[in-house]
Amino acid sequence: MYKRQPERGLRSQVTVDPKHLERYRQVCGFRDDGLLPPTYPHILAFPLQMALLTDKRFPFPLLGLVHLENRIDVLRALGGLGPFTVSVAVENLQPHDKGATFSIVTRLEDQLGLLWVGDSKVLCRGVKVPGEIPPKAEQEPLPLEPVDNWKAPADIGRRYARAAGDYNPIHLSAPSAKLFGFPRAIAHGLWNKARSLAALGERLPASGYRVEVRFQKPVLLPASLTLLASAAAADGQFSLRGKDDLPHMAGHWSRLQG
């Protein structure tokens, strides 16, 4: 059960199922290091996020929302199985040249306080809101080198759906994806991010860091993917690319200040 917070979204108490955690690690390529994968709180929060987005008071249709960007802040090491308090809220409504964007902000807390924060920037096409379109922040690109490559099999959308609970039809099969204009099923954006962070491994610290990604071209399944990254450092960049160097996702990591 979740508790309704009219001014702040929804919140709930959650615990980690070890068998489910192991399934997620296997699907996304994370090794068992005794910590939760940095993307796993998204999975803990997904039922609550769906409850918020399907609430009758939510102003935008769920169908057709596009996940543009995702940011996570790992404030402390993600140890233990809970209980945790997870909360979700919709924030930062802004105009966009194709409609409007908003952020699904997710927070995970333990008994010591705030542990993890996620921000998923979502586009709703055709919606008009007042204000000026914010400028896009661009980083000076760093030299990247290949660090790993893997196959994204035709069934990875279904396998990830079973681990994450996200059964969006564009990820499940070619027939269901074609109903939404895709020639084949496409990989979940958060699977692309999770698989990439698993491959980055020790380039990322255990805590006190941020990872931001921008989703680019969809990964049509099956696919062969290559991860490129800058040298190991406190701050760095990475890119997930497919056949003919097609860009699927661009990201960077940085140390949190303070």
Model-predicted segments: where are they?
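Intrinsically disordered, low-complexity segments enriched in polar/charged residues with Gly/Pro
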Residues: 58-64, 80, 92-96, 204-206
